[in-house]
Amino acid sequence: AVYLNLCTFFESGHFPDHTSNIYDMFSSAMIAPLSDAQQEFLTVMGLADEFTVEMALFITGNQEAGQILSLMTRQNAFITPLPDGVSFRFHHMMKECTQRAFAMLSHEKQADFRNRYGQWYESQGQFLQALSAYNKALNYDAALAVIQKDAGILLASLSPEKVLAFLDACPTEILKNRPLALLVLMRRMFTWHQIPKMLELKQLLTDTIAEDNTLSEDERKNLSGECDLIMSFLMYNDITGMSVLHRQASSKMTRPAISIRKTGSWTFGSPSVLMMFHRRSGTLDAELTAMNECMPHYYRITQGHGQGAELLMNAEAAFMQGNFSDAQILLEQTYSTIASNGQHNISLCCDFLAARLSLFQEGVTFVKNPEVKRKELLSLHNMMWMNIFDSTYAYYYALIRMPEKIPALFKDHMLSTVSFLSPCRPMMEMIENQVFLSQKMYAKVIGRSETLLPVCEKMHYELVSLHVQIQTAAAYAMLGKHHDARQLLQKALGHAMPDGFLIPFVENYTYIKDVLSSINSITP
């Protein structure tokens, strides 16, 4: 600010008064004296948060971009080299001024540069940045191509409102020209609980399959089969019902699904497979059998997406029943099955089980110091993986009563700031309940559970509901309301015993032991 004031004084003979615009002062002092080529360089590259010389060459189309950047970095403290030795960043004041200058360019020039940004980010696999650039350039076809490439993986981190706004703006004919992108969007609409929009997109896809004469018969069948695969999610957590459509899809398809990537999320962000698919009390054995029979059909058309899920579900079931050695063997089999096949989601779910199992069984592989793994996950740029990782350590540290070590997302109760996919939110809320218990915020647990239990019932989340009932009973017990605690525990026992579930009671035993001992019978 002092420098800008002095510049104004030397130019005009007086210091600026309180009505002066700081951005105008900055532009006059730092940008206006530069050559046209330098000004254009700043104007265009000001859209980037960070950039390299290679990126600047591509975006500006100026072969002297490297020399310009080198000169300006030496002469201008408002362009900063970053510690990696190859990237640069504008000072926020410079960035604001150059973005204002960019807004003064013609619409054609703006669109041209934004398309270049889109092409650059797309080539680097930075699909969200590419999508944003193409969207601002109104290049809907290129944006849909990016959505298809991403297969909904990074798209999941956007708010539903942003994607719905994009769909409202995108012409129908352009949507119909990208049937594979429609499939990706259908699946994402399901995870955001936007079912009417999902069905609307399905109709567009059906029309395309019927009307597009350029499609071969094989591709029509592949698209129809992949549509069956996506529509199976409407029967989510009914394993047998989903598998009917998986087998139907498998009979039509001659290629793997394109709208579901092998490396993408399988659990929608849930840290547990069993919590997703245990639907009714007393049906555990049938659910495990169905999962074992159904998953091979799904793997065939998705190149092994979610591979190991059925093994992990069996491991979790054994753990829940207190069969720790069986659980450990199945867990190690799952780790071995998914080794080096890119199934980060299932691996993180294995870690969730390992964390809990390590409290009961010796020799369980569980990383007590999570910082190295956190850095590895951050390099993948996938917030869903980070959220599963945080949920594991939140639950673990809540169980061992070390709330100070719980990751900030859960410790500071910031779940409302995260755009979780709807199938995983009840699990995250249940884990936050356990955190509240460890923080002795018992009334909070009771108040939240009144809202969470009906959601679990509606989604057929029997196991999540069981956890929440026990947590609520624990909170009542800690507040001295033993009658309320006893009623909830008796109800929970009635739900748990047909499947032999013990561990949710054991994990909360410190809170409920006095009330539990007062219950005469634990048979349902």
Regions found by a protein language model. Give the residues of each.
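C-terminal non-catalytic interaction modules
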Residues: 427, 434, 443-447, 451-524
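Residue register of alpha-helical TPR repeats
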Residues: 44, 112, 180, 219-222, ...
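C-terminal leucine-rich, beta-strand-based interaction scaffolds used for sensing/assembly
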Residues: 28, 32, 48, 53-96, ...
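Amphipathic alpha-helical "lid/sensor" segments that cap RecA-like P-loop NTPase cores
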Residues: 1-21, 36-40, 46-50, 61-62
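Internal alpha-solenoid helical repeat scaffolds
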Residues: 174-350
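Extended alpha-helical scaffolding segments used for macromolecular assembly and cargo binding
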Residues: 100-181, 185-188, 197, 201-204
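Helix-turn-helix repeat elements of alpha-solenoid scaffolds
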Residues: 108-111, 124, 152-165, 193-211, ...
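Amphipathic alpha-helical segments of tetratricopeptide repeats
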Residues: 74, 131, 151-152, 167-172, ...
